[in-house]
UniProtKB/Swiss-Prot annotation:
Name assigned to this protein: 27 kDa hemolymph glycoprotein
PANTHER family: EG:BACR42I17.2 PROTEIN-RELATED
Places the protein is found: Secreted
Keyword flag Glycoprotein: yes
Tissue: Hemolymph.
GO cellular component: extracellular region
Modification(s) after translation: N-glycosylated.
Protein family per UniProt: Belongs to the UPF0408 family.
One matching Pfam family: DUF1397
Signal listed as a keyword: yes
Keywords attached to this entry: Glycoprotein, Secreted, Signal
Source organism per UniProt: Manduca sexta (Tobacco hawkmoth)
Origin superkingdom: Eukaryota
Residues bearing carbohydrate: 125, 156
Length: 233
């Protein structure tokens, strides 16, 4: 049900964010899908409000980080061994990002069903903890990841990672079958995906990216219902 919230947010963002490479036709398609979802929830009059909340979210992200600027800063800091200073600066903005995400979830609420809304708490908690994970010790983890070739490792492993995702997707015969699957079985699928991704990244010359990816995925699992349903060491 969390995915319903994310899908509504994505559709609205795709309509508004010019940085997303979409044709006018595709953008209009997402606009119509958003309107249909709001209409389904009896909130067709709230479409503009939802779009406004997403517009504010996009502006919030722009205020936190400029992708081109941070890319340049990383390139300049990496040979000097000063990546920690770059991420320390951006991680200082983590509280603002958390507020932006919370506001976004509140903004799309009118067009999301009650079951999905009931998952808002866990979703917000998970996103906050992911931000805390990335920004642990002022961004030490992400700085180490970049310094040890994390970006290059992921780029070189793109095809293998895609295969992992495809295997996961193909393991579900249908949407209905996925919904009917028991929680332990779903957790097993997540564990299989984790193993596949980590194995792919372990082919890189430096083990750090694989180790950090594994730590992140374990962190996500620990904060999910899987931790109680299928405990792991």
């Amino acid at each position: 049900m969390i995915w319903k919230t994310l899908i509504v947010a994505f559709m609205a963002t795709a309509v508004l964010a010019q940085e997303i490479d979409l044709s006018d036709q595709r953008r209009e398609q997402y606009r119509n899908m958003l309107a249909a979802q709001c209409r389904k929830m009896g909130a067709e009059d709230k479409v503009k409000d939802v779009e406004s909340s997403v517009r504010n979210f996009v502006e919030c992200l722009r205020g936190i980080v400029d992708p081109q600027a941070i890319k340049k800063e990383i390139e300049e800091a990496k040979p000097k061994g000063e990546l920690d200073e770059v991420f320390k600066k951006y991680c200082a903005k983590a509280p603002v990002l958390k507020t932006c995400i919370s506001s976004l979830l509140d903004g799309v609420r009118p067009c999301v069903d009650k079951v999905a809304i009931d998952h808002y708490g866990p979703l917000l908690n998970t996103t906050n903890q992911l931000i805390d994970f990335v920004c642990y010790k002022d961004g030490e983890r992400i700085a180490l990841f970049i310094a040890h070739g994390g970006s290059e490792c992921f780029k070189n492993s793109t095809e293998d990672l895609k295969k992992c995702a495809e295997e996961m997707k193909n393991s579900f015969p249908s949407v209905e079958a996925a919904k009917a699957m028991s929680l332990p079985d779903k957790c097993g699928k997540f564990d299989d995906l984790t193993t596949c991704m980590v194995t792919s990244l372990e082919k890189c010359e430096n083990p750090t990216p694989a180790n950090m990816a594994e730590s992140l995925l374990k962190f996500i699992r620990k904060d999910s219902p899987c931790n109680a349903a299928v405990p792991k060491d």
